[in-house]
């Protein structure tokens, strides 16, 4: 009787091991497939002669990079930009009418465990709002915004002070001015402001919520900013937000575009806030 019991127990243990092994392999394949989709896109849109970016505190210019906008838009017209940020962030930015749409869809609009980097549905697609919100998952393997955790250290931020958003008209350079760890109910997700003075009040509130600030990069009430939002592992309603102010726009021929051009675009924007899900 005892022998039969242990034989049955051994069979059950073996079945459990096989089941969990299969589950682990299945999840591993999902992560690999998600990673591979973006790796292919990156290879297709990175010049062969591109070298390592020099992201130092005295440089607002990244190395030449120009995605194949014609091909990208032909495959998925929801693309509104491309973001690059040290150490590994290098992804297209999507936008849909519903923020849930790209939570678990890749660039090809099929299931991808990584989801997509995407601009909030309430924002203008040209990044002309005072505060544009860009979401991305915090993946354990470092994909998407998974390496943003490096920016919890102020020293790392000082060594890597910029991120870049590319649009069809050129390169938008943002300098990071604060990092915060907040709840998803924070005012950090406000995108529309009645006046520049209201935006200045918002900035003061962000200073109070920040884990740290970069004083010499702090924006004025006339600036435009981008907030990069990702979830914090094991803390369901907690978010990490990295905020950067726009400091330069350069077209693909190397000429600067006046920052005031964004103000004109924003005056023609009809975006209105809603209560979409946040990452």
Language-model features, listed with the residues they occupy:
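Hydrophobic membrane-insertion alpha-helices, especially the h-region
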Residues: 4-23
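Solvent-exposed, non-transmembrane regions of membrane-associated and secreted proteins
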Residues: 17-279
